[in-house]
Amino acid sequence: MIDDDGYRPNVGIVICNLDGQVLWARRYGQHSWQFPQGGINAGETAEQAMYRELFEEVGLSRKDVRILASTRNWLRYKLPKRLVRWDTKPVCIGQKQKWFLLQLLCPDADINMQRGGIPEFDGWRWVSFWYPVRQVVSFKRDVYRRVMKEFSGVVMPLQETAAQRSASAHRRKRG
């Protein structure tokens, strides 16, 4: 399903933990890392696609997460010319994405990249909130910057709360 401008509708998923860190996933058999993402099927809403992709790519279900936010608008990126498949019709020149910010509600051990069938990722880790903006492949960087800027107002309070919890625990240990 490609729109008239050549963009494939897609969802992107940012999963954060209670410390305000985000899940960063390594593409299967590659050295590149990114957030989970995937196409929206015909007849599927963006939210339905997000939950399907969440299971397929990370092995989590609706009960394992809580939606904290979604982007107000669709965000687009163009593929580099070397990645465009010119022999397909219609030609897909890039992705238009609706992004979701999710809070992880289950233990980290429930994350399973193999659960959803053919794995798209072979590893993951928690990273600081802004880390992905600097590390993602260059043609996705502007979208990542815009997504993280939009979601920062939701995640920053989580980080402040985590810092307060940590300071409180440290004081209890010393006292």
UniProtKB/Swiss-Prot annotation:
Task: Please tell me whether the keyword S-adenosyl-L-methionine is annotated for this protein.
Answer: no
Mind telling me which InterPro entries this protein's record contains?
Nudix_hydrolase, NUDIX_hydrolase-like_dom_sf, NUDIX_hydrolase_CS, NUDIX_hydrolase_dom, RppH
What EC number(s) does its UniProt record assign? 3.6.1.-
GO BP: mRNA catabolic process
Of the GO CC terms on this record, one is: cytoplasm
Record's keyword terms, sorted: Hydrolase
Q: Domain of life here?
A: Bacteria
Q: Which SUPFAM superfamilies match?
A: Nudix (SSF55811)
Give residue ranges for domain Nudix hydrolase: 6-149
EC category name:
hydrolase
Motif Nudix box: residue span?
38-59
A molecular function (GO) held by this record is: mRNA 5'-diphosphatase activity
* Needed cofactors: a divalent metal cation
Which function does this protein serve?
Accelerates the degradation of transcripts by removing pyrophosphate from the 5'-end of triphosphorylated RNA, leading to a more labile monophosphorylated state that can stimulate subsequent ribonuclease cleavage.
**Similarity comment: family membership:** Belongs to the Nudix hydrolase family. RppH subfamily.
Q: How is this protein named in the record?
A: RNA pyrophosphohydrolase
Gene name, per UniProt, is: rppH
